[in-house]
Structure formats: structure tokens, C-alpha cells
């Protein structure tokens, strides 16, 4: 009998804290954490570095065959992104790359290009995977589905703090506008739009700190998976 692997899908808008909470939950449970947003960021970074326009579908698709993406996991269990052999884990966290990711992720061909990579990880590991369409498209049969959200204002504040800690100060109003625009783009795109799966639990962390959010997330998981 093949071993049973559990999959936890966490979806939600930009800046909702998906990656931070999913990473902490994976460490708590001993699961593999898969940040799918990092994969799209890597594609966007590759296109931009080569002089391509991420908003031009033809230019993006023309560059796909040249892109070699790999994921590795260090002893700390953290995911590292490799682009044609180069570790770009830090580079993809620059604020501009977030916009690139939103653009390239709107193309069905890009999503199809990356789908098998994501599903293979879930076939062979206990995984916690976060993104925009994990519970609806990538892992529709996930054992646990959570739609994680927070108000745009709270997400902008959190993102500001995160960027400041990285030495990348940004204007709050500008960031709030970018988040609002990305929410619209992600939820209105033709390919795998951002939406809550019908069988997903909703977790709004607007009024919760990190510890309370993590405990609430853990409670949802324990209701659905025998841990």
C-alpha cells in the first residue's frame, strides 16, 4: 500500500500572511512548505532580467523554454528558488517582482507550465502549499483548504513593516493602491482567478496577531486531518 500523504491548501490575496503562516504551520507539523508565489516570481524575474515585458504575453511565452526552475530545501526546511542554477530566493522578494508575478500568472500557458511541478510535490510529500488557486486548481482534492484574508489596509501595513525590515522602505499609500489593484487583477483574470473554494474554511486575520492567527489555522487543520 502506498503511503498516505496529506495536503493543505492555503489561498488568499496578496499580503494576507499566507507564506509566513504556512511556513510556521509546516514547521509545527513537520510538513514540506511550498510557496507557489515564489515560483511565479521566479518566472517574472527571469523575463524581466532578459529584457522582456511581463505584460506582453507573446514575450513571456517566447522565453518559457529557456527558463529552468528548481526548488531546494535547506536543513532548516526553507524553500530556495533556483533560476537556471542561480539562487534567486532574495532577489524575488524585491517589491517590483511582485508585479511581475501578477502579470505572468495571468497567462494560462505559464500556469500549465508550472502545474506538474507543484502537483508532484504533493504526490510525494506531506505538503502545505500556498498561493491563489491551490484549493481550486492545483490541488482540488486537498485534505484541508483554507482561504486566508485580511483587510487591504491591514495587509498594506504588514507589507510595509516587512519591507522596512529588509531595508526597502515604501510609501504606505502607494502600497495600498498596489494591493488594491492586484486584488482586482487576481480576482478578475481569466486563468484561475483568485476565489475561495466552496469547501474552504475562511480565516480573516485582520484583528489577529501572528500567534493567534497560527493557532486559528492549526485548529482548522486539526478538525480535518488526524494529526
Regions found by a protein language model. Give the residues of each.
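Hydrophobic positions on the alpha1 helix immediately C-terminal to the Walker A/P-loop
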Residues: 21
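Small-molecule kinase domains that catalyze NTP-dependent phosphoryl transfer to phosphate-bearing small molecules
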Residues: 73, 118-125, 132-137, 141, ...
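ATP-dependent NMP and nucleoside kinases share a basic, alpha-helical "lid"
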Residues: 89-166
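Conserved lysine of the Walker
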Residues: 18
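N-terminal phosphate/diphosphate-binding loop that engages ATP/GTP or pyrophosphate donors
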Residues: 27-93
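The conserved Walker
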Residues: 14
Amino acid at each position: 500500500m502506498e503511503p498516505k500523504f496529506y495536503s493543505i491548501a492555503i489561498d488568499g490575496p496578496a499580503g494576507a500572511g499566507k507564506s509566513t503562516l504556512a511556513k510556521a504551520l509546516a514547521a509545527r507539523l513537520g510538513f514540506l512548505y511550498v510557496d507557489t508565489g515564489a515560483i511565479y516570481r521566479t518566472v517574472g524575474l527571469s523575463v524581466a532580467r532578459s529584457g522582456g515585458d511581463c505584460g506582453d504575453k507573446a514575450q513571456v511565452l517566447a522565453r518559457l523554454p529557456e527558463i529552468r526552475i528548481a526548488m531546494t530545501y535547506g536543513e532548516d526546511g526553507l524553500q530556495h528558488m533556483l533560476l537556471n542554477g542561480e539562487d534567486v530566493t532574495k532577489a524575488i522578494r524585491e517589491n517590483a517582482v511582485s508585479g511581475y508575478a501578477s502579470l505572468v500568472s495571468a497567462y494560462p500557458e505559464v500556469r500549465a507550465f508550472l502545474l506538474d511541478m507543484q502537483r508532484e510535490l504533493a504526490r510525494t510529500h506531506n505538503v502545505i502549499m500556498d498561493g491563489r488557486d491551490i484549493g481550486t486548481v492545483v490541488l482540488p482534492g486537498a485534505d484541508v483548504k483554507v482561504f486566508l484574508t485580511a483587510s487591504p489596509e491591514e495587509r498594506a501595513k504588514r507589507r510595509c513593516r516587512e519591507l522596512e525590515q529588509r531595508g526597502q522602505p515604501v510609501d504606505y499609500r502607494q502600497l495600498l493602491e498596489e494591493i488594491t489593484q492586484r486584488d482586482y487583477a487576481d480576482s478578475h483574470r481569466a486563468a484561475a482567478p483568485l476565489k475561495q473554494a466552496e469547501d474552504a474554511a475562511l480565516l480573516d486575520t485582520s484583528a489577529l496577531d501572528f500567534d493567534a492567527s497560527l493557532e486559528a489555522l492549526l485548529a482548522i487543520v486539526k478538525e480535518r486531518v488526524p494529526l
